[in-house]
Amino acid sequence: MTTHNDDAAAALPQDENKIIAERRAKLSALREQGIAFPNDFRPQHKAADLHEKYDGKTREELEAEPVTVTLAGRMMLKREAGKKAAFATLQDASGAKADGRIQIYATLDLTGEAAMAALHHYDLGDILGVVGTLFKTKTDELTIKVTELRLLTKSLRPLPDKFHGLADQETKYRQRYVDLIMNEDTRRTFKARTAAISSIRRFMAENDFMEVETPMLHTIPGGAAAKPFVTHHNALDMEMFLRIAPELYLKRLVVGGFDRVFEINRNFRNEGVSIRHNPEFTMMEFYAAYTDYKWLMDFTEAVIRQAAIDAHGTATLTYGGRELDLAKPFHRLTIVGAINKYAPQYTNEQLHDAEFIKAELKKFGVKPHAHSGLGALQLALFEETAEAQLWEPTYIIDYPVEVSPLARASDTVAGITERFELFMVGREIANGFSELNDAEDQAARFQAQVAAKDAGDEEAMYYDADYIRALEYGMPPTGGCGIGIDRLMMIITDSPNIRDVLLFPHLRRED
């Protein structure tokens, strides 16, 4: 049956204060009756479950075996047929991938005079509790024939017009609660996010990984090349940092004998905001003793593929109107190999000429650090010429030592580490490597990072003496990887902006 919004939902901004005042008056009347916010209604059913179970029933079957239901939800639509009958649509949070909505039908005869009179004064956005029996309308829509109707929560603010929604994108992010009420796609996105993260946790548990929690406040920022947020611990009178990565703590646990550990939690980096970056973001990092970066690539591929299947129903996704197949084996290229493939104008000789690469980077507006060697320059050129073209899942492998201070050096190629980064749809999704477990080598690399920081590199790492001490007790050969959960969710849910997959993204203060 066709239903429509009422005037309150289509309110113009200048009418909003008037509508709020009218609703407050209704709430005042409820307070006087002592029934403003009851908390004794217990729903027993969900809209999506009722549709799944009874949509296939005929009108005759529902009449022959009446089904009594008790349900609560927010009233999203209402259509009155005089004083004797009214249809409304209630919305609850049910449904694996979307919302649950179900129509209700109230009549003077069945619902009662007092409840019907009250219904006429209910507004869209009000939360109602209903008891009734299921039936099907002439248009075969599953509907609850109401025998008991109660107002559970009075909504004071009018909902946006359903045809126009929230006024702009920033308002959607700032008032996510309204966006979730109005937008089925938003609800579907965050249900998919939950499904994907639950899938990852199951996959890790099935592969004998132990989930752990490590500190969010660090005395030394480490585990990644990034600028930290700085805070002060009053009781200890010391400077502390919101963590940029949990890596060094997780590897301490491997030293302690936990061979397989993982953590899904927040990291914080005091850097720019963009459609791909948020200062607070979710990462999964995992470490497995007696593995290397080749094992990690296979395992990471399997984790991501299963998460996509569990959240999306298939490993074949669509992003921005273009297909992305996660079912196929992921590609593997070196940094120079990727440049050769996606920027074939460069010769092999040019790609091994540091001065030539510096000149090319200048054309892109990139000024490398004075201490940058050939490997770092090649990586910078890759980022400018090839990275954005890596649509299909691709591992870029064998990163230079100078940009990989925590990775194990290659046994066969000087200056190269056993490290990879995973890219898809032109953005980095994961970073992993065979871990450096040589305490003396790690100490030397930390010293090189300190020198780089002294030379002006704000993202260079600090020297972590306690981590070196941990390595001196002996860490088994280990592989470790970090997966950017938010960016992965963007791809799985076909979301163009990282804010679309964060329930409450960071925004500037409201005026």
UniProtKB/Swiss-Prot annotation:
Q: Where in the cell is it found?
A: Cytoplasm
Q: Which PROSITE patterns is this protein grouped with?
A: AA_TRNA_LIGASE_II
> According to its record, what are the GO cellular component terms?
cytosol
Q: What is its main location?
A: cytoplasm
- What catalytic activity is recorded? tRNA(Lys) + L-lysine + ATP = L-lysyl-tRNA(Lys) + AMP + diphosphate
Q: Which annotated residues bind Mg(2+) 1?
A: E421, E428
Q: What is its EC number?
A: 6.1.1.6
Residue positions binding Mg(2+) 2: E428
- What is this enzyme's class at the first EC digit? ligase
Cofactor(s) this protein requires: Mg(2+)
> What is the protein name stated in its UniProt record?
Lysine--tRNA ligase
Q: Which species is this UniProt entry from?
A: Janthinobacterium sp. (strain Marseille)
Recall the taxonomic lineage recorded for the source organism.
Bacteria, Pseudomonadati, Pseudomonadota, Betaproteobacteria, Burkholderiales
